Amino acid sequence: MNIKIIVIGKIRNEFIKAGVNEYLKRLLPFINIKIEFLPSFSELSEKIALLKEEEIILKNLRNGEFIITLDKDGEKISSEEFSKKLFKLPISQNSQITFIIGGIYGVSEKIKQSSNFILSLSSMTFTHEFALLILLEQIYRALKIQRNEPYHY
């Protein structure tokens, strides 16, 4: 399985970097996973920032990717449902799943419309850094559920 995670903004908190690195270390033996950090335009107005971020996100998408965008208004599913969805996607060995984590303003409507699925991690709002860490933990949990290994109780 190939997973790409597009994140607007970079990680500034060392404890989150440590958590991200820990989950990448756990996942890499089983999943080809990479994270692409794209620039944030949070210093601009919301409208302009969303347009600029939309442009760079779209440039980083390829045909054939199954796109899952994280958004607080997306579908809320359990860890078990996430595992089923992730490992039952109709993708070939050469294609990939791409997750998109927006910046301070989220993602544009065009990005949402370009997505195959919109996922909510919670009704609460998280920084892009926390969203990345939570997503990686949920991908790891999904893998453990799929492999019927202890971790998820």
UniProtKB/Swiss-Prot annotation:
State the compartments where it is located: Cytoplasm
Q: Please identify the protein, giving its name as recorded.
A: Ribosomal RNA large subunit methyltransferase H
Q: Which gene encodes it?
A: rlmH
Query: GO CC annotations?
Result: cytoplasm
Per the UniProt record, which EC number(s) apply here?
2.1.1.177
Give the InterPro entries listed for this entry.
Alpha/beta_knot_MTases, RlmH-like, tRNA_m1G_MTases_N
Catalyses:
pseudouridine(1915) in 23S rRNA + S-adenosyl-L-methionine = N(3)-methylpseudouridine(1915) in 23S rRNA + S-adenosyl-L-homocysteine + H(+)
Question: Its principal location?
Answer: cytoplasm
Q: Which residues bind S-adenosyl-L-methionine?
A: 70, 102, 121-126
Q: Write down the SUPFAM superfamilies for this protein, in alphabetical order.
A: alpha/beta knot
Q: Which organism is it from?
A: Dictyoglomus thermophilum (strain ATCC 35947 / DSM 3960 / H-6-12)
What is a GO molecular function of this protein? rRNA (pseudouridine-N3-)-methyltransferase activity
